[in-house]
């Protein structure tokens, strides 16, 4: 099938969903353009910073568009491209976008409270504590997986027959790494200038584009040839500053600048597909069971992950984005619209992977990011862009996908950890509690543990990430059901996605747990750091994940039971009032 037809069908469905279903949700729940939002009410120049709809949407999309849409859609295509396309469209419209918009809506209507605080208000303190611990563990997994991927993307070395040598893509990877560093530097410059001059509209856009051009000009001419370990250190240093600095100084300007790159990347993919309109070489459907991945249920759903629905998105919506919404009318654009864009990105990634596959349906060699990067870079070359420039640009884009999620999740992890131990009267709290709630201490502790988990390796931790991510979305949906019920708003549209996600995620987690137990019992061979013994390697790759998986299952089940009790109680109270 022609990939152009697939993209056009997806675009029509997603745009129609935003215009019809998204607006219906906003009308059903109620939007008040005259209401004072938390960003305006509590503007502190750090976490609460008012931003217009465009900037808010760019922040949301940049934070959401991590490794998931590209990696998930490409990997899940092992079941065939049609099941992936259907789940991305249906999941994105009725599951993901609804969850993201709902989380943002609930937070804005509650003074910008994070999901943990919302759970305390509508479900109880125990539910909040359990949820915050769940979120923090989940964030550790995300930090480890994405940081390992970023460091690997910029790595200029490879090992051949036990000998470390420069990789063929050393210059390209090194240039992309330097561009990324300069991107951070110029993001701070952008933030300072924006803060002083209060630019908007085309002036703000021009400044952002100039900063992007400057970053590429320096980076492409001064590549940094470092190994993976060095890039890992650099990545974690960046994450630290992104987690503690004011939003306006680094994260917001970086997200704004990154959005321009994403637009160029998506435009390049779309125009390339329009001009070349390559054939979708991947099979339509391969069966309900895949030898490598497992059964379609639940693996397809947790593998596609962020392209259809993601619990992480809700943490961004309630943790950072709700504190930047300047007007309630922007919530639809920020919450529902950004997710629609991410679903479109997943469709593009699927089509690029399909075009890169061999005529007999054999997938292209390389990781999903490498396949996507090479494919879109090839489209840019069609328009006269030099191969080196196109490859550096796309390498930077795919790494930015992970970095924008990394800085968001690091801030969310820090805030979740602080909320976990905070009390109302922190001025008279115990010294140990003050230490744990200290911004710098909580950030360092989180990042150190995240760094330790990178030793597991991105490929080993991804399956657990997908399952935990989807379970998080189910927990958020339960909270939203209670919130909407208590506040007298309709919540019926949340029941189908809630039930389906609970079934999918608990099944996937149990399957993953059983697989890890089996691997440990059999001392199975796994991809491990050099120098580890077999049993030590099995524990690193499976034992630590087993511990986290058990904790996630127990925490998730406890939160579900606790939330259901609260929902029944709130329903009875509501009926009693009537």
What are these regions (language model features)?
Residues 2, 70, 82, 141-166, ...:
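Transmembrane helix-loop junctions in multi-pass membrane proteins
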Residues 125-140, 337-343, 390, 419-455:
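Loop-to-transmembrane helix boundary motifs in multi-pass membrane proteins
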Residues 16-70, 259, 295, 299:
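Membrane-interface "cap" regions at the ends of multi-pass membrane proteins
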Residues 23-49, 72-75, 85, 89, ...:
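Flexible loop linkers connecting adjacent transmembrane helices
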Residues 16-30, 134, 174-218, 228-275, ...:
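Membrane-interface loop-to-helix entry segments
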Residues 67-74, 91-99, 103, 107-111, ...:
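Membrane-helix boundary/coupling elements in multi-pass transport proteins
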Residues 2-19, 76-107, 116, 175-187, ...:
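Extracellular loop-to-transmembrane helix junctions
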Residues 101, 273-287, 340-375:
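Extracellular/periplasmic helix-exit of transmembrane alpha-helices
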């Amino acid at each position: 099938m022609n990939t152009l037809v697939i993209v056009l069908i997806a675009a029509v469905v997603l745009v129609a969903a935003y215009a019809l279903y998204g607006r219906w949700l906003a009308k059903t729940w109620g939007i008040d353009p005259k209401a004072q939002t938390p960003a305006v009410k509590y503007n502190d120049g750090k976490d609460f910073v008012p931003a217009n709809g465009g900037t808010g949407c760019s922040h949301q999309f940049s934070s959401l568009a991590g490794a998931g849409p590209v990696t998930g859609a490409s990997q899940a295509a092992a079941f065939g491209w049609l099941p992936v396309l259907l789940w991305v469209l249906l999941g994105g419209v009725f599951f993901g976008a609804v969850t993201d918009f709902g989380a943002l809506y609930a937070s804005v209507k509650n003074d910008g409270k994070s999901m943990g605080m919302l759970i305390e208000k509508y479900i109880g303190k125990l539910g909040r504590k359990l949820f915050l611990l769940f979120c923090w563990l989940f964030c550790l997994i995300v930090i480890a997986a994405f940081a390992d991927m970023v460091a690997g993307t910029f790595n200029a070395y490879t090992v051949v027959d036990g000998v470390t040598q420069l990789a063929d893509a050393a210059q390209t990877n090194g240039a992309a790494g330097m561009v990324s560093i300069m991107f951070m530097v110029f993001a701070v410059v952008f933030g300072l200038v924006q803060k002083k001059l209060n630019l908007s509209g085309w002036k703000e856009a021009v400044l952002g584009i100039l900063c992007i051009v400057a970053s590429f000009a320096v980076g492409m001419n001064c590549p940094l040839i470092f190994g993976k370990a060095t890039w890992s250190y650099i990545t974690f240093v960046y994450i630290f500053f992104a987690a503690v600095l004011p939003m306006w100084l680094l994260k917001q300007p970086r997200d704004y600048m990154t959005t321009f790159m994403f637009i160029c990347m998506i435009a390049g993919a779309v125009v390339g597909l329009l001009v070349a309109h390559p054939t979708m070489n991947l099979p339509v459907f391969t069966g309900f069971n895949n030898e490598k991945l497992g059964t379609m249920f639940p693996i397809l759903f947790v593998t596609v992950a962020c392209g259809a629905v993601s619990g992480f998105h809700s943490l961004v919506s309630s943790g950072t984005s709700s504190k930047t919404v300047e007007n309630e009318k922007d919530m639809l654009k920020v919450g529902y619209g950004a997710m629609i864009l991410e679903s479109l990105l997943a469709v593009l990634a699927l089509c690029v992977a399909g075009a890169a596959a061999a005529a007999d349906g054999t997938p292209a060699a390389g990781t999903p990011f490498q396949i996507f990067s090479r494919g879109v870079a090839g489209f840019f070359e069609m328009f006269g862009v030099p191969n080196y420039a196109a490859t550096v640009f796309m390498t930077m884009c795919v790494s930015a996908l992970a970095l924008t999620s990394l800085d968001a999740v690091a801030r969310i992890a820090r805030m979740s950890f602080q909320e976990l131990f905070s009390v109302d009267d922190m001025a008279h709290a115990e010294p140990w509690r003050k230490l744990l709630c200290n911004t710098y201490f909580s950030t360092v502790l989180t990042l150190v543990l995240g760094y330790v988990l990178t030793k597991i390796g991105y490929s080993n931790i991804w399956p657990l990430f997908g399952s935990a991510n989807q379970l998080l979305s189910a927990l958020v949906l339960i909270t939203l059901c209670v919130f909407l019920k208590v506040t007298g708003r309709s919540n019926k549209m949340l029941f189908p996605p809630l039930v389906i996600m609970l079934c999918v995620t608990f099944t996937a987690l149990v399957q993953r747990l059983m697989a890890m137990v089996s691997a440990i019992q059999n001392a199975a061979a796994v991809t491990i750091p050099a120098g580890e013994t077999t049993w030590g390697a099995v524990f690193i790759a499976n034992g630590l994940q087993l511990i986290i998986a058990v904790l996630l299952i127990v925490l998730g089940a406890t939160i579900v039971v606790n939330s259901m009790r609260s929902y029944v109680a709130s329903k009875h109270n509501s009926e009693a009032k009537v």
